Amino acid sequence: MSVAQNYGTGRRKSSTARVFIKPGSGNISINGRTIEDFFGRETLRMIVRQPLVVAESEDRFDIAITVKGGGISGQAGAIRHGLTRALMDYDETLRPALRKAGYVTRDARKVERKKVGLRKARKRPQYSKR
């Protein structure tokens, strides 16, 4: 007798988030902690809530999130992506609004690897002409 829930997977940088939404009162649980405990910065909490604001459903769902890998910024982006996918799974008519806001597209930017002979990914050693 499981209650109907919708699922979405989100990724950003090296973070992966699994997001489950079900009708409720607006509780957000991330790895068993509240959103306030998990994200200290208000900007990160705002990033997580953005798809709910666009869908005008801040207090309509209880959200359970498991997130792994990366840092806090990447995790917030992964949660936003996963929440967007879960909302689209719940109601496909939300897709155009979420797409217009830019939340549907996976941000494919990753850290570029360091190359041999260079100091960083692109920074070269100083060149001496003479």
Swiss-Prot record:
GO terms for cellular component: cytosolic small ribosomal subunit. Pfam families: Ribosomal_S9. GO terms for molecular function: RNA binding; structural constituent of ribosome. SUPFAM superfamilies: Ribosomal protein S5 domain 2-like. Keywords: Ribonucleoprotein, Ribosomal protein. GO terms for biological process: translation. Belongs to the universal ribosomal protein uS9 family. NCBIfam families: PRK00132.1. This is Small ribosomal subunit protein uS9.
